[in-house]
Amino acid sequence: MAVKIKLTRLGKIRNPQYRIVVADARTRRDGRSIEVIGRYHPKEEPSLIELNSERAQYWLGVGAQPTEPVLQLLKITGDWQKFKGLPGAEGTLKVKEPKPSKLDLFNAALAEAEGGPSNEATQPKKKKAPAKKAASDIEATADPAGNADKSEPAAEGEDATVAGATEG
């Protein structure tokens, strides 16, 4: 029986994801497989290539033929060089940088905050309008005895007569 190592397609329309499988050469692309030995996601950056190297070496050793795309993946991971006894068995696989854990991020932020808690405002204070301050100073100097209460109703009355004159 002729055995091939090939890709079976999974995923959405524009987001292909593949399984690297060992299957009979006569089966269709997504047909029954003998064994799944890895996966390949070409749309990720860098492309995700996971391959069980031990099982790939076994199947290559018993005569399984890789298809062209799988052969390229085997060369990237270094399994083809290892099988053939060529130099460069470490491969050229790019590895995605691991994400920092949330605990590490939290500890870093905590250390930064302890380093110098600032009492300064993030935005400068807005200055009050000088007209209000000047008006309150004038009232305080004009009537220090507290007669300001008597003068206010008179001012209100004047405003009322002026408003009444304009209405009529």
Curated annotation (Swiss-Prot):
One Pfam family from the record: Ribosomal_S16
Any one annotated GO CC term: small ribosomal subunit
Domain of life: Bacteria
GO biological process: translation
UniProt keyword Ribonucleoprotein, yes or no: yes
InterPro entries listed in its UniProt record: Ribosomal_bS16 (IPR000307), Ribosomal_bS16_CS (IPR020592), Ribosomal_bS16_dom_sf (IPR023803)
Keywords annotated in UniProt: Ribonucleoprotein, Ribosomal protein
Disordered: annotated segments: 110-168
HAMAP family attached to this UniProt entry: Ribosomal_bS16
Family: Belongs to the bacterial ribosomal protein bS16 family.
Name this polypeptide is given: Small ribosomal subunit protein bS16
Organism whose genome encodes this protein: Mycobacterium sp. (strain KMS)
The gene coding this protein: rpsP
